[in-house]
UniProtKB/Swiss-Prot annotation:
GO cellular component: ribonucleoprotein complex; ribosome
TM region(s), chain numbering: none
Disulfide-bond pairs as recorded: none
Protein name in the entry: Large ribosomal subunit protein uL10
Gene: rplJ
Molecular-function GO term, any one: large ribosomal subunit rRNA binding
Species the sequence originates in: Aliarcobacter butzleri (strain RM4018) (Arcobacter butzleri)
Keywords: Ribonucleoprotein, Ribosomal protein, RNA-binding, rRNA-binding
Gene3D superfamilies: 3.30.70.1730
SUPFAM superfamilies, alphabetized: Ribosomal protein L10-like (SSF160369)
Amino acid sequence: MTREEKSQVIDFLTAEFKSSLAVVVCDYKGLTHKELETLRKEAKANNTKVQVAKNTLVTVAVKNAELGDIELSGTNIFLWSDDQISACKVADKFASANKEKFAIKSGIIEGQISDASKVNAFAKLPSREELLGMLASVWMGPVRNFTIGLDALRRKKEEEAA
């Protein structure tokens, strides 16, 4: 890789990491190409980006993005997204399906370096859409109960009139 290519990779990763709220670092040693493609498809479906890059280049990109110092070693694949949950969920789901070959090492969530347990904890949280659905359901409960009560009152009045 030439110096120019390295610079382009660093610039790309710096921009991506600055705009993302979660970066997950995983060990992918032993995964086949087909399994990696499955991970990429799953990530794309969840608005998460995936890339394998040299540890030294990622370390420089993380420093340039002012996300702290992260120590990287071994074979790493990086997943990132513009929300805190989706990258963690994709990594956790794939790690569960490929326990022997894929493991979450660490992550950077909202600018703070996190260990694997914190990444797993974020993966267990409901997504934004799920939370909005729960909130809408809670808001609709009283309205639904009120309409059921009105309907029962209407039926009672009709029975009394008949």
